[in-house]
Amino acid sequence: MRPSTTTLSLLVFLISSILLATTGKNSIIRYTYFPILLIICHLQLTNPPVNTASNIFDGSFEGTTLLNGLQQLNILVLTGVDVNDESGSSVFRRLKSALIYPFNARGVGTKYQIKNLPVLSSFICKEKQGESGLSSFLSSARYRFAIRQLAVSAWQYLLADIGFSLLKNIPTEKRLEYYGPEEEWMPQSLDQLRVRIEATLVFWVTLKAFAEIQSKIATALLTAVGVTSPHDWPPFFGSLREAYTLRGFWGKWWHQQLRWPLTSYSNFITRRVLKLTRSPLERYLNNALVFAQSGIVHVYFNWIKGVQDGDVGCMAFYISFVAGYFLEDHVQGLWRKAFDRTSAQESSLWLLERLVGALWVATFLTIVTPWWVYPFLRLSSSLKMPYSFVDVFGFQGALTVVFMGAAALRIGLNAEP
């Protein structure tokens, strides 16, 4: 009997943590672990997919196994993290530090911390003194953080429930008409264009909410019991106000969980193997390699979820952003040259630039998102949460709670859900 994907993931985590705590940066033992890691990853990749008929969370853990393997290899070999530099000589302290890295994909609080991390809300960071009762409880940044995380995650669960309900509750004949094979590439009518715009908007709003739920619950619990502090967990996503360019969309607004491992591999290829100097060629090749790796990770998730015809569209979606970056960079360069200013200078036309930029990003996403998403939308059975409040209270009732909840979170907890 073959070990489960979960068992293999725990094995990778355990071995990697022990090696990280007990070996140095250039230890030969780390390199001998590489073929073992490849074998384990092969077993994970060739395990049969889980049953996809239950809900959207099924397979989520298995879907991260490939990324986890890539991150372990990055930490041990490519980046070569040495916890002796950070934790002194105590084996216990080195092991504690080593256990953090597999869960710290953004390198928070280390010298490997990625760029453009969002900052914690002032609601969490501000000090409150001399209060009693509930106010005294809330004077602790730790508990304010936990309460805020749990409250926002509950709101996001309901929002994701609404989004998946909108995508799921479509008659079969309409589903095939709108999302059928080959429909993802180009709309053939105004009605299909309308559906394309609606599906893209609902998908990204829903995915953003869904992607944060498990993280917020886990970080709330870890912080509430004192294992971590709020400063260990900068916001998972940045501000939507930064998403007026494609680079801002991926580099400042969207989550950065893949950034460190994937850029480590792309930099290894471009700078250490190909010996490229910093140049436009090196930059765009790095972009292409990062998006190609991201595409492969998400194709694996497709397989886990039982999506049989989405591999080409998924890869095309991610690779398309290289062309988008190229076009965006050159148009911005021409614009700055026309107004004789550097990229660091603030333009008097900043509002126009952001409006045009937001329209550009929305248009690009509307074109390419269905390439990736429509094969998922053809599988209505998995487009649901473990428990649907929409099925119980109705769409209008759930939507009312979402709007009221958003206002309450903003006013009471200074949250931007």
Curated annotation (Swiss-Prot):
Membrane-spanning regions, if any?
A: 150-170, 284-304, 307-327, 356-376, 389-409
GO cellular component entries = membrane
> What GO biological process terms are annotated to this protein in UniProt?
lipid metabolic process
* Cross-referenced PANTHER family: LONG-CHAIN-ALCOHOL O-FATTY-ACYLTRANSFERASE 3-RELATED, WAX SYNTHASE DOMAIN-CONTAINING PROTEIN-RELATED
The text of the family note is: Belongs to the wax synthase family.
Subcellular location(s) per record: Membrane
Domain of life (superkingdom): Eukaryota
Give UniProt keywords alphabetically.
Acyltransferase, Membrane, Signal, Transferase, Transmembrane, Transmembrane helix
Provide the function of this protein: Acetyltransferase; part of the gene cluster that mediates the biosynthesis of the benzazepine alkaloid nanangelenin A which contains an unprecedented 3,4-dihydro-1-benzazepine-2,5-dione-N-prenyl-N-acetoxy-anthranilamide scaffold. The first step of nanangelenin biosynthesis is catalyzed by the indoleamine 2,3-dioxygenase nanC which produces N-formyl-kynurenine through the catabolism of tryptophan. The two-module NRPS nanA then utilizes anthranilate (Ant) and L-kynurenine (L-Kyn) to assemble the dipeptide product nanangelenin B.
Protein name as catalogued = Acetyltransferase nanB
Known InterPro entries for this protein? Answer: Wax_synthase, Wax_synthase_dom
GO terms for MF: O-acyltransferase activity
Indicate how the chain sits in the lipid bilayer. Answer: Multi-pass membrane protein
Predominant subcellular localization, coarse grouping: membrane
Task: Look up the record and name the pathway of this protein.
Answer: Secondary metabolite biosynthesis
* Residues of the signal peptide: 1-24
